[in-house]
């Protein structure tokens, strides 16, 4: 483990100012208000285990299947979205090299049958620490994606679930958030924290950031609990909850180990049908 990775594990910010730094707030506000935002950039956020990466991978692949130009930026050091799209985690260049080492974004993008990927790696775990002394550190990802935004209809960013500099970069790069929520009671507990984070970032960094949609995952409509959770989420996010729900499906769980999205692994299964339905609903909302 590198010294940067050790530092990254020890350094855990607890508030907005410790991530951004007071001296960056005015600059951030000015840039956010005077410059255009990255069009068609969607950030997938949420706690681990709710289907965040699964949804990022499979919605991107489903849109590619439907003929759209899609880039998936894996901004999580675990790099599960990278491997889920069939890209080796040990690829020579990735998003870390773009942000820290100055590699051109296009040179780091990997083309796959399921969509283009800006891959992640374990090196990104220390990236947040390395960014601390860099100018405009919260805008590094946005600048990297700006270089290729005209090449794609949609850019998806899979980010870490914790509040840290990597996540802040993703929030500054995105127009919208897509929030997967598991159809279980405890999934409701983080909603207030999520909305508070969005309000802070919108107020200080990215005034156009919005909740694009909320997706219920691992959903079992046969249980009263799942139905109650769905009702509560719809009350919390009126008009934002997708009609499509993602069911529990063993084939969805198997697909990542084969390095394939579900539409390539088993297009006839319930999971693939659900993500294709989600892709069509997504397009209706965003075209």
Residue positions per predicted region:
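P-loop NTP-binding core
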Residues: 52-287
């Amino acid at each position: 483990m590198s010294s940067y990775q050790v530092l990254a594990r020890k350094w855990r910010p607890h508030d907005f100012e410790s991530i951004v730094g007071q001296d960056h707030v005015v600059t951030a506000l000015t840039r956010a208000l005077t410059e255009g935002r990255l069009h068609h950039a969607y950030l997938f956020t949420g706690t681990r285990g709710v289907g965040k990466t699964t949804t990022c991978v499979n919605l991107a692949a489903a849109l590619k299947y439907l003929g759209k130009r899609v880039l998936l930026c894996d901004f999580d050091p675990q790099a599960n979205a990278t491997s889920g799209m069939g890209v080796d985690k040990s690829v020579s260049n990735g998003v870390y090299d773009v942000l820290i080492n100055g590699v051109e974004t296009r040179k780091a993008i990997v083309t796959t049958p399921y969509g283009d990927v800006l891959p992640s790696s374990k090196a990104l775990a220390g990236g947040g620490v390395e960014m601390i002394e860099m100018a405009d550190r919260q805008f590094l990802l946005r600048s990297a994606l700006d270089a290729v935004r005209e090449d794609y209809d949609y850019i998806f960013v899979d980010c870490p679930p914790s509040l840290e500099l990597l996540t802040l970069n993703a929030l500054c790069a995105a127009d919208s958030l897509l929030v997967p929520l598991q159809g279980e009671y405890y999934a409701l507990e983080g909603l207030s924290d999520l909305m508070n984070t969005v309000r802070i970032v919108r107020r200080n960094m990215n005034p156009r950031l919005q909740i694009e949609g909320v997706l219920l995952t691992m959903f079992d409509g046969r249980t009263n609990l799942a139905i109650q959770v769905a009702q509560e989420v719809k009350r919390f996010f009126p008009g934002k909850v997708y009609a499509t729900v993602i069911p529990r499906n063993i084939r969805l769980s198997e697909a990542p180990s084969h390095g394939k999205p579900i539409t390539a692994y088993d297009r006839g299964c319930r999971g693939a049908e659900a993500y294709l339905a989600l892709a069509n609903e997504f397009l209706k909302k965003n075209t």
